[in-house]
Amino acid sequence: MSAFTPASEVLLRHSDDLEQSRILFAGDLQDDLPARLDTAASRAHTQQFHHWQVLSCQMGDNARFSLVATANDVADCDTLIYYWPKNKPEAQFQLMNLLSLLPVGTDIFVVGENRSGVRSAEQMLADYAPLNKVDSARRCGLYFGRLEKQPVFDADKFWGEYSVDGLTVKTLPGVFSRDGLDVGSQLLLSTLTPHTKGKVLDVGCGAGVLSVAFARHSPKIRLTLCDVSAPAVEASRATLAANGVESEVFASNVFSEVKGCFDMIISNPPFHDGMQTSLDAAQTLIRGAVRHLNSGGELRIVANAFLPYPDVLDETFGFHEVIAQTGRFKVYRAIMTRQAKKG
């Protein structure tokens, strides 16, 4: 998170105009521009724990991580710079939340890559802060407007729900597989053996569907779930509650907040961070798993077949197995033995 993204580079073209502003940065904060831009004052709000980790090191309490921003998070700000995410419902949740808190007259900037659909910000904010495009560069658009009317924000109206084999799944904007169970997770679920026992960690838990499905046929497992995403953490908690499953759920950048060892780690790891392709999380997951597995414990992950995980698995564990595959996905299994490197 050191090099600036194209969106931030577009903003830097206007840095002179922002020096006297008291800015709230929010949305898909992929770099540390909020901590480095010369302003009268800067705050940041993010739903992504790994982004908060980086920003809080430089901004302290002026960087906040939560599902819903509060009045304290936007206090004294006269400008919003919002980085448009790839997910439109996620943008709507965040913008309606923030604009309901900011005072009328607040300057509103929205910036994002053209391929993310940033141009739809104009229609989304038309009734509250009419936007005009003020710059276009690096395949990004920058839009500006002024808040004329605060929207009414009700987080409860953004919840979604679907069923999988009799299980209730609760979801929020920005959560992976928000509209239904994805094919990769289905394949991973098909490999989980009934009547499994022991401690199981679900990394990148999303809406919690893997864990509740596993718990249904293996009720003696002791589950722990984590995700970098605040919406995912809240969705998993709701999914677990709806299905009567008890578990600890918390925000973590892969293993950053995880303590102790487990008998099994399961994951459908992401390979995108915002609009960018990133294998960092999955490689951190594989390499770090050996420090959180009991002897004889296993890592079981599903991934797109083209991703280069076999080499990392072999390098870390000494070997791996492919226990299920389709044309698009593979389920990998690696066992914690004396060969595994705990480096």
UniProtKB/Swiss-Prot annotation:
Function: Specifically methylates the guanine in position 1207 of 16S rRNA in the 30S particle.
Subunit field text: Monomer.
InterPro entries, alphabetized: DNA_methylase_N6_adenine_CS, Mtase_sm_N, rRNA_ssu_MeTfrase_C, RsmC/RlmG, SAM-dependent_MTases_sf, Small_mtfrase_dom
Record localization: Cytoplasm
Source superkingdom: Bacteria
Pfam families in the record: MTS, MTS_N
Family: Belongs to the methyltransferase superfamily. RsmC family.
UniProt-recorded name of the protein: Ribosomal RNA small subunit methyltransferase C
Keyword field: Cytoplasm, Methyltransferase, rRNA processing, S-adenosyl-L-methionine, Transferase
EC number in record: 2.1.1.172
GO (cellular component) term, any one: cytoplasm
Gene3D superfamilies: Vaccinia Virus protein VP39
GO molecular function, one term: 16S rRNA (guanine(1207)-N(2))-methyltransferase activity
Catalytic activities: guanosine(1207) in 16S rRNA + S-adenosyl-L-methionine = N(2)-methylguanosine(1207) in 16S rRNA + S-adenosyl-L-homocysteine + H(+)
Keyword Cytoplasm: yes
Lineage: Bacteria, Pseudomonadati, Pseudomonadota, Gammaproteobacteria, Enterobacterales
PANTHER family attached to this UniProt entry: RIBOSOMAL RNA SMALL SUBUNIT METHYLTRANSFERASE C
Signal peptide, first to last residue: none
